[in-house]
Amino acid sequence: MRLTDYTDYSLRVMLYLAVHGEGLATIQEISDAYGISKNHLMKVVQRLGELGWVDTVRGRNGGLRLFPASLRLTVGEVVRATEADFALVGCFAADGDSRGCVIEPQCRLKGVLAAARDAFFAELDRHTLGELAAPASSLVSLLGIRPIAVVRAEPAAAGSAEPPSKAD
């Protein structure tokens, strides 16, 4: 079974945002980190937003962030939501468009392949995005995410209501 690029990119966006933490990331940053087309990512991000997994903030200072509950999503949930087809062979087709096979009435291969697919999803369902994003420090450096520097303002001196004076 091979996942589509769309699903691959969806998982990558979700992992990037999970590692990114607080603050907003941009599609351009994610594109640069993975070397993926920005246009492809725009489609992916739109869908992730529609699913309610990613908060998309529009505007000049906009960007993306993962909703906290999304860290509890399993890889299987993401794959199921972003893949269109899990038919491993023609006789699995759900839309009735199966290719006729002369051995279908006696075929045991279909059951073996169905069990393999189910085992694949069982494994994906064991892992959450939050689990895969930890420890974030190793992924942060690989993805080129720069930590946000927090600058704390100095408290004003007690009894002083005036701002600090400039040195002449």
Question: PLM ranges: what are they?
Answer:
Residues 18-22, 68-69:
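Short helix-capping/hinge SLiMs at alpha-helix to coil transitions
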Residues 75, 93-168:
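C-terminal regulatory/oligomerization modules of transcriptional regulators
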Residues 13-20, 81:
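Short amphipathic alpha-helical elements of helix-turn-helix/winged-helix folds
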Residues 52-61, 65-67:
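Beta-hairpin "wing" of winged helix-turn-helix
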Residues 14, 45-46:
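Short, hydrophobic-biased segments on the C-terminal half of alpha helices
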Residues 27-34:
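A short alpha-helical element within helix-turn-helix/winged-helix DNA-binding domains
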Residues 39:
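Key DNA-contact positions within bacterial/archaeal DNA-binding proteins
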